[in-house]
Amino acid sequence: MEMTSTQRLILANQYRLMGLLDPTNTQKYQRLEAIVKGGFGLELKELDKEFSDLSEAECLTVLNTLEMYNALQISYNNLPDKSALTPHRLQFAGYCAVREKKYLNYLRFITSVEGKYQEFMRCEHGCDSQTPMWDKYLKMLDAWRACPHEYHLSMAEIQKILNA
């Protein structure tokens, strides 16, 4: 993380204030203040770990994925015969917390802060799929977009999307 001296001073002062405001974490904030004041490059990278860059296209892909799962659920619920597919197959898996953390963070922002698609936060392990899902969701989105009626899917179309 590159910072000017002024930025470092401001951040160091913020950590000092946080230590005063939150006595239970004083040691943590003192450590962070020392890192920023010292300009220790290796440890400064630590501060950067919580930040992620998510492009507008990536945000839209996450939102489109949630909307696709919404359409899958609506279509499934409207089917007269559901025997060919279990409801578990329609459950949104989330994103890998290790390899896809930025997508998982955005998902949590959308559901928790924005209050949208909250029904998808019922996924297992806090929506940590524990395996990368981004590429799978892209294929599923392509299959979904190829369907003539995105919200009135047949059983065959639902299965085709899930198997993409």
Swiss-Prot record:
Database matches in InterPro entries: UPF0304_YfbU, YfbU_alpha-helical_sf, YfbU_helix-hairpin_sf
Lineage: superkingdom: Bacteria
Gene3D superfamilies (UniProt xref): Helix hairpin bin, yfbu gene product, domain 2
Pfam families: YfbU
Coiled coil (residue ranges): none
Family note: Belongs to the UPF0304 family.
Name used for this protein in its record: UPF0304 protein HSM_1818
Biological source species: Histophilus somni (strain 2336) (Haemophilus somnus)
